[in-house]
Structures are given as structure tokens and as C-alpha cells.
């Protein structure tokens, strides 16, 4: 999990304002940070199968959001990646 401060930083960077948490780019950024932190967790805890399920769900959610963003606003998609 990422800290509240890190989430706020991502919201301000990708969303523009503190209240713009539902923006697709913000959601993708938060999921990416979560995924990166979970990668470190799985490097140490290889047998944690329960958390792996949640990790895969986050990866799939990010994949769907990226596909949506690519379809709706290609320039924002390129900036996000």
C-alpha cells in the first residue's frame, strides 16, 4: 500500500487538483505505484499466493484503464505512459 502523502502527490501531478481523484490518469498512477510496491513484496515473499490474487486484479484493472484512456484520449495516454 502506498501512503496518503504519496497518493496526494500523484493526484496533484496527474489530476491537477486535490479533489480530482476519479480521473483515469490518477487511477492509473495510483495503481502503478501499488503494483510497484507489491513487486518488492513478492520478491521477498514468494509463497504469498493470497496477495498474488489481489496483485493480478490490480494489474488487470490498470490494463483496462489504459485501454480506455487510449481509446478516449490518445494524447493523455502517451503522457501517462
Curated annotation (Swiss-Prot):
Q: Keyword Chaperone: yes or no? A: no
InterPro entries membership: Ribosomal_uS15, Ribosomal_uS15_bac-type, uS15_NS1_RNA-bd_sf
* Entry GO terms, CC: cytosolic small ribosomal subunit
Keywords attached to this Swiss-Prot or TrEMBL record, sorted alphabetically, are: Ribonucleoprotein, Ribosomal protein, RNA-binding, rRNA-binding
Tell me, what is an example of a GO biological process annotation in this record?
Answer: translation
GO molecular function per UniProt: rRNA binding; structural constituent of ribosome
Task: Tell whether RNA-binding is among the UniProt keywords.
Answer: yes
Function text:
One of the primary rRNA binding proteins, it binds directly to 16S rRNA where it helps nucleate assembly of the platform of the 30S subunit by binding and bridging several RNA helices of the 16S rRNA. Forms an intersubunit bridge (bridge B4) with the 23S rRNA of the 50S subunit in the ribosome.
NCBIfam families (UniProt xref): S15_bact (TIGR00952)
Q: Which PANTHER family match?
A: RIBOSOMAL PROTEIN S15, BACTERIAL AND ORGANELLAR, SMALL RIBOSOMAL SUBUNIT PROTEIN US15M
Q: Which family does it belong to?
A: Belongs to the universal ribosomal protein uS15 family.
Q: How does it assemble?
A: Part of the 30S ribosomal subunit. Forms a bridge to the 50S subunit in the 70S ribosome, contacting the 23S rRNA.
Q: Which HAMAP family match?
A: Ribosomal_uS15_B (MF_01343_B)
Q: What is this protein called?
A: Small ribosomal subunit protein uS15
Organism, by scientific name, is Mesomycoplasma hyorhinis (Mycoplasma hyorhinis)
**Gene that codes for this?**
rpsO
Amino acid at each position: 500500500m502506498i501512503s496518503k502523502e504519496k497518493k496526494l502527490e500523484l493526484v496533484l501531478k496527474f489530476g491537477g487538483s486535490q479533489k480530482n481523484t476519479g480521473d483515469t490518469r490518477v487511477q492509473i498512477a495510483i495503481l502503478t505505484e501499488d503494483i510497484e510496491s507489491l513487486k518488492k513484496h513478492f520478491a521477498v515473499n514468494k509463497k504469498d499466493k493470497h496477495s498474488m490474487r489481489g496483485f493480478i486484479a490490480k494489474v488487470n484493472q490498470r490494463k483496462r484503464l489504459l485501454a480506455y484512456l487510449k481509446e478516449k484520449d490518445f494524447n493523455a495516454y502517451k503522457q501517462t505512459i
